[in-house]
Amino acid sequence: MLFWVLGLLILCGFLWTRKGKLKIEDITDKYIFITGCDSGFGNLAARTFDKKGFHVIAACLTESGSTALKAETSERLRTVLLDVTDPENVKRTAQWVKNQVGEKGLWGLINNAGVPGVLAPTDWLTLEDYREPIEVNLFGLISVTLNMLPLVKKAQGRVINVSSVGGRLAIVGGGYTPSKYAVEGFNDSLRRDMKAFGVHVSCIEPGLFKTNLADPVKVIEKKLAIWEQLSPDIKQQYGEGYIEKSLDKLKGNKSYVNMDLSPVVECMDHALTSLFPKTHYAAGKDAKIFWIPLSHMPAALQDFLLLKQKAELANPKAV
């Protein structure tokens, strides 16, 4: 009996693996739209999918980002300047994309644009500190999706939302984590709403990667700027050396940071080209081995492990 059970499990594993490797036949007639292509995941994705033969429409925030990307890609790739927080800009871009793709529609929408905002303890922050990452990471993503969705439905294509392990675990204070938690919720409701239309919706949850988004120097600079504005009471609670201790903790976590961005793009590739795309992708060894498993653990264990990564306060009772 045990032999048959093991045999059945092995067969199921083989068929599941085989299923994941089945690909769409032709990509050379398919259009994809990617946001946040100035640098990082979006830039690498645009270059990678251009080489594969997709008709890539890459949205950049800056003219310099657009120019640099066009210099590294084929004439087939198109760029457009896009601020995802500007509703009129998004509407104009969607109309322009509609004219580009014609009756083929849009096979892939990759919502990648994002910002970290201020990553600092909650009691250091104001409502405005929360606003920027939520405007870009959540409302910007929703705005682009709503405007591009008719084109994706026409092609019975794919929507790929780049979230984060920060959408599964509250690793840091600030607006980044709430924005990514909300992206996860939007992604799941969209996936169920689009199923009847033959549109597949996937969510990618990268771990810690070395990108402009996670530049520790910029993180510390923003913390220092906020520190200067804090009340004497809060400064006393945290202590003058708190930021330096936080920096030491960041340096100690370098081993967790993925230097190679390609795992995220590989997830995008599978979500775009597989006949059976996954609903969720964990990108990076740290995401697969630590962050995602931890997100399923009891809150007490999460708190214990995550609090060990935080710098100690000088005098938390000074309130």
From Swiss-Prot:
Its EC number is 1.1.1.209, 1.1.1.53, 1.1.1.105. GO terms for molecular function: alcohol dehydrogenase (NAD+) activity; all-trans-retinol dehydrogenase (NAD+) activity; androstan-3-alpha,17-beta-diol dehydrogenase (NAD+) activity; androsterone dehydrogenase [NAD(P)+] activity; oxidoreductase activity; racemase and epimerase activity; testosterone dehydrogenase (NAD+) activity. Highly expressed in trachea and epidermis. Detected at lower levels in spinal cord, bone marrow, brain, tongue, esophagus, heart, colon, testis, placenta, lung, skeletal muscle and lymph node. Residues 1-17 form the signal peptide. It catalyses: 3beta-hydroxy-5alpha-pregnane-20-one + NAD(+) = 5alpha-pregnane-3,20-dione + NADH + H(+); 17beta-hydroxy-5alpha-androstan-3-one + NAD(+) = 5alpha-androstan-3,17-dione + NADH + H(+); androsterone + NAD(+) = 5alpha-androstan-3,17-dione + NADH + H(+); 5alpha-androstane-3alpha,17beta-diol + NAD(+) = 17beta-hydroxy-5alpha-androstan-3-one + NADH + H(+). Belongs to the short-chain dehydrogenases/reductases (SDR) family. This is Dehydrogenase/reductase SDR family member 9. It comes from Homo sapiens (Human). The lineage of its organism: Eukaryota, Metazoa, Chordata, Craniata, Vertebrata. The gene is DHRS9.
